[in-house]
């Protein structure tokens, strides 16, 4: 295992732990999710460059699409909660009744 792959794995793990630890605010949870998606994107991009498979070339682009969708939905929820309640607490998600 190379040191770059180890660093990316640690970045993913720290973002995952941050998601579990900082659950009270939606903004910090969204930032941790973006860190996870960024580390996944870089890991798949580097592994795609090392392999010569044409099928695996689309995986990093697919991860970017999912990251963009996750960011859009997360920011829409953040705006809705902030406008309605004035705070970005995750406990307010239950009150939206979506």
Swiss-Prot record:
Top EC class for this record: translocase
Quaternary state and interactors: Core subunit of respiratory chain NADH dehydrogenase (Complex I) which is composed of 45 different subunits.
Family: Belongs to the complex I subunit 4L family.
Presence of keyword NAD: yes
Function of the molecule: Core subunit of the mitochondrial membrane respiratory chain NADH dehydrogenase (Complex I) which catalyzes electron transfer from NADH through the respiratory chain, using ubiquinone as an electron acceptor. Part of the enzyme membrane arm which is embedded in the lipid bilayer and involved in proton translocation.
Compartment(s) where it occurs, according to its Swiss-Prot or TrEMBL record: Mitochondrion inner membrane
Lineage of origin: Eukaryota, Metazoa, Chordata, Craniata, Vertebrata
Organism, as annotated: Rattus norvegicus
One Pfam short name: Oxidored_q2
Record GO biological process: ATP synthesis coupled electron transport
Protein name: NADH-ubiquinone oxidoreductase chain 4L
Principal subcellular localisation of the protein: mitochondrion
Cellular compartments per GO CC: mitochondrial inner membrane; respiratory chain complex I
Keyword vocabulary terms for this entry: Electron transport, Membrane, Mitochondrion, Mitochondrion inner membrane, NAD, Respiratory chain, Translocase, Transmembrane, Transmembrane helix, Transport, Ubiquinone
TM annotation in the entry: 2-22, 26-46, 59-79
MF GO annotations: NADH dehydrogenase (ubiquinone) activity
Reaction(s) catalysed (UniProt annotation): a ubiquinone + NADH + 5 H(+)(in) = a ubiquinol + NAD(+) + 4 H(+)(out)
Topology versus the membrane: Multi-pass membrane protein
EC number: 7.1.1.2
InterPro entries: NADH_UbQ_OxRdtase_chain4L/K (IPR001133), NUOK/Mnh_C1-like (IPR039428)
